[in-house]
Curated annotation (Swiss-Prot):
The gene is hflK. It is a single-pass membrane protein. HflC and HflK may interact to form a multimeric complex. Belongs to the band 7/mec-2 family. HflK subfamily. GO terms for cellular component: membrane. It is found in: Membrane. The keyword Nucleotidyltransferase does not apply. The chain crosses the membrane at residues 15-35. This is Protein HflK. SMART domains: PHB.
């Protein structure tokens, strides 16, 4: 006969083994984790940093190890004042306080803006401050308030948005490095900037119209400039070239005359009488060849009656 007690003991042993294996499997499975391609995992052992893991399947030791997964390759962003649309700003004075900032000329401007950042050091991001996202938000608001306070409302709306956003980015990165938060601010954007309704908004609209008119006149002036100036420059260059040609011609003629004069002078110095006679003969020949009705009159002749005038 079967020993019931022995069978029970064997069954109990197998059951214990099965339960133990199941528990071990559950514990192992519970401590297996997957790190995504855009993430890194921080593993703490007894509360201290033990290792940092890249993407893949990993296992941690139960009870004594703890893991934190951080998205290090994703650009994250924090938005400010996006509850307000431009129509809300014009129609409602009860705008979101987060979007209202005092400018350097003591006006109030409503701004919709955002900060984009990436995590550079997962451990510093997770453990250097208690609430990193709130800290980043406070740093961003402080930097934006300071930069807005350095500009007038019209500079912010029309001219200097890029300067402000670059200044906020630089200021944030400097403060973040001092606090060792382990992030890099990638970009700061001002999506919308409008004054509240009232006289300031009306003045802003007037300025915008004036700026549009100014740009219109500038473009018209540039168009006329581009049409007229090249033509004038061409005419000026033509006159300059003609003057240069005339100058060269006069210089060359003067040099030629100088060479002729020097040759005559040399001949005269060698044979003055012969040279005088030759010059006289050449001059008379030129006169007689080119003139009509030449009359030769004796200088001692008196009471000369010009026959050519007698009719």
């Amino acid at each position: 006969m079967f020993d019931i007690k022995q069978i029970f003991n064997k069954t109990y042993e197998y059951l214990i083994i099965i339960i133990t294996l199941i528990l071990i499997s559950i514990i192992v499975i519970a401590n297996i984790f997957i790190v995504g391609p855009s993430e890194e995992a921080i593993v703490l052992r007894l509360g201290k940093l033990n290792r940092t893991l890249d993407s893949g399947i990993h296992v941690k030791i139960p009870l004594i190890e703890e893991k934190f997964i951080v998205p290090v390759k994703i650009v994250q962003e924090i938005k400010f004042g996006f509850l307000i649309s431009p129509s809300d700003i014009r129609e409602n004075d009860n705008a979101n306080d987060e979007s209202r900032i005092i400018t350097g000329d003591l006006n109030i401007i409503n701004i919709e803006w955002l900060v984009q950042y990436k995590i550079r050091d997962p451990y510093s991001f997770k453990f250097k401050v208690e609430d990193p996202e709130t800290t980043i938000k406070d740093i961003a608001k402080s930097s934006m308030n300071r930069l807005i306070g350095d500009n007038t409302i019209f500079e912010i709306i029309n001219d200097n948005r890029v300067g402000i956003t670059e200044g906020v980015k630089s200021s944030m990165n400097e403060i973040i490095d001092n606090y060792n938060l382990g992030i890099d601010v990638v970009q700061v954007q001002i999506r919308n900037a409008l004054p509240p309704k009232g006289k300031v908004y009306e003045a802003f609209e007037d300025v915008n119209i004036a700026i549009q008119d100014k740009n219109k006149y500038i473009n018209e002036g540039r168009k006329e400039f581009n049409q007229i100036v090249p033509k004038i420059k061409g005419e000026a260059l033509k006159v300059i070239e003609e003057a240069r040609g005339y100058k060269e011609s006069r210089i060359n003629n003067a040099l030629a005359d100088t060479e002729i004069f020097n040759a005559i002078l040399d001949a005269y110095l060698k044979n003055p009488d012969i040279t005088k006679e030759r010059l006289y003969n050449e001059t008379m020949k030129e006169i007689l060849e080119n003139k009509d009705n030449i009359e030769l009159i004796d200088k001692n002749f008196k009471n000369f009656l010009p026959f050519k005038e007698v009719k």
